[in-house]
């Protein structure tokens, strides 16, 4: 359980940082489209909820180590996508 707690904590920190970066970019990076900012913030919150739930409920029939490695890979990809979107706010 300790590892799951650490993984959830990491997800919380990363998503919080992404949310803060998105807010900062929207305030200090020119005048981005408010709808784009809203959609990006919503996607960060949705991503957070989704991954926290996935940590708690391992896929049946799948080895835990494989499941969590896959989860981390997908999370990292999603984080990089969000970072690219934040960088693209104009």
Regions flagged by a language model, labelled:
Residues 22-55:
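Amphipathic alpha-helical interaction modules
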Residues 8, 12-15, 19, 41-45, ...:
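Generic structural concept
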Residues 2-31:
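N-terminal acidic leader/helix
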Residues 42, 50-90:
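Low-complexity intrinsically disordered segments
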Residues 3, 18, 45-46, 86-90:
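A broad "ordered helical/assembly scaffold" signature
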Residues 1-4, 30-37, 57-68:
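Alpha-helical rod/repeat scaffolding segments in eukaryotic adaptors/tethers
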């Amino acid at each position: 359980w300790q590892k799951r707690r650490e993984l959830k904590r990491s997800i919380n920190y990363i998503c919080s940082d992404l949310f803060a970066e998105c807010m900062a970019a929207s305030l200090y990076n020119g005048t981005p489209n408010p709808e784009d900012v809203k959609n990006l913030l919503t996607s960060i919150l949705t991503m957070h909820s989704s991954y926290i739930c996935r940590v708690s409920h391992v896929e049946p029939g799948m080895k835990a180590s494989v499941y969590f490695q896959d989860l981390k890979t997908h999370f990292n990809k999603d984080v990089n996508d969000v970072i690219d979107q934040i960088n693209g706010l104009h």
